Amino acid sequence: MNFEQINLHLEAYKEHDQILDAAKYLIHSFDLEHENFAGFGFRQELSPTSMLLTAEGDLGGPQTVMIPRNLFDFDLNLVLNMVAHEMLHVRQKAPGNVIEDKNEREFQAYYEMLFHKVFPQIPEVSDFHKKFFGGKALEYYKRMGEGSMLQQKYAEQKTEVEHLINELP
């Protein structure tokens, strides 16, 4: 993947205020598309230093990924991981694949941001963001309920997350 070329394309989209088109270009370039994806829409920006993306739609129905207009003001590796996180939610909410429990969906998505098992083409983020995303994964694991079936199902992945966090500087 030629990141320099991708950045040039994204800059051109930004110059013409074509943020939604830039996002479509990104998911196409990194093979993140899915039939349950209904498209992108805008959500309110949080701040110049933080962003929030969401996948919105009923479980089992098409999902719209809501992005802030300043999405492409952030580091491309971080943006790709954030978009991949939401595109995993698109898959998790697809007919025939619905994962009902929000804590399970979020744990899977944050785990993916660390280990890239579903989307190996997505680059790694900084150690700072790995620690942050690892912490979020553990938070959602805890919310599954102490000793629950879900916690048992994801015990091995939880250990992987803890190991990764502990190995980071």
Q: Model features per residue range: what roles?
A:
Residues 2-63, 72, 120-122:
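Auxiliary, metal-adjacent structural segments of Zn-dependent hydrolase domains
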Residues 5, 21-25, 77-78, 132, ...:
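Exposed alpha-helical structural elements
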Residues 66-83, 99-100:
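Short pre-active-site segment immediately N-terminal to the catalytic Zn-binding motif
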Residues 81-84, 110, 114, 138:
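Hydrophobic core segments within long, regular secondary-structure runs in both alpha-
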Residues 81-94:
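Active-site recognition of the HExxH zinc-binding catalytic motif
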Residues 95, 101-134:
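Post-HExxH zinc-binding segment in Zn-dependent metallohydrolases
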Residues 119-169:
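Long, well-structured alpha-helical subdomains associated
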